[in-house]
Amino acid sequence: PNLRASQAVEKLWEAILATSRVTEDPIAAWQAHNQDLHDRCAYLNSLHIRELHYKASNGTDFHVGMIPEARFCGGAEKSLQGIVFNPNIPSEECFISPMRGKAEGIVYSSKPLSYQSQLIDRFWIRFHEGKAVEWHAEENNDLLTKLIEMDEGSSYLGECALVPFDSPINQSGILFYNTLFDENASCHMAFGEAYPCIKNGSNMTRE
């Protein structure tokens, strides 16, 4: 904010390239990073986790149940045609689809949420039987309400993601005002439809 526009744009590009691992050898950097994410996911999957319990000094105390046979995913994926690709760059998360109806407790934000070019900040959300039933934001509460009450499924969780504290995006100290970047700064949850991150999920019908 204290830089001229041209300097700010240059600094932003530097931050984007650094957090996206565009180094002298980005292919090698991403191969190593993908392997690290896959190893983390494999370890988490080996634990056969039935529930995640989030507890923090900011007041968060939240339980969310996992779908049986759900899998942690992260990093590069392989398409049904056998093509290996990275769906998101940058990406620091190991994510999983939670069980609908199995979320209880309260979650407090540790970072602001950029939504529709506005910031929702200093907010909390209380869940009961999987659904967001109560919430409040000190900044842009009406926008948070709009997000949660968008449609029938928007008050239920579709993703829980684990992100290391030493994530390059978190270490940068920058709020990018872009979810693809900002979600990779900390552990997070997402409302709405879940990904089929479940054993043999791509072969299942919606029913």
Task: Tell where the protein language model's regions lie, with residue ranges.
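Dual-mode signal for accessory low-complexity, basic/Gly-rich regions
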Residues: 134-203
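Structural beta-strand/beta-sheet cores of well-ordered domains, especially the beta-sheet scaffolds
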Residues: 50-52, 60-62, 103-105, 111, ...
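Short solvent-exposed loop/turn micro-motifs enriched in small/polar/acidic residues
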Residues: 45-47, 116-119, 153, 182
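Long, well-ordered mid-to-C-terminal structural blocks that present hydrophobic/aromatic surfaces
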Residues: 96-146
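Flexible loop/turn segments at secondary-structure boundaries
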Residues: 1-2, 60-63, 71-73, 114-117, ...
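Active-site bordering "gate/hinge" segments
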Residues: 1-104
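Short, structured patches in soluble enzyme cores that scaffold and shape functional sites
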Residues: 56-58, 66-68, 111, 136, ...
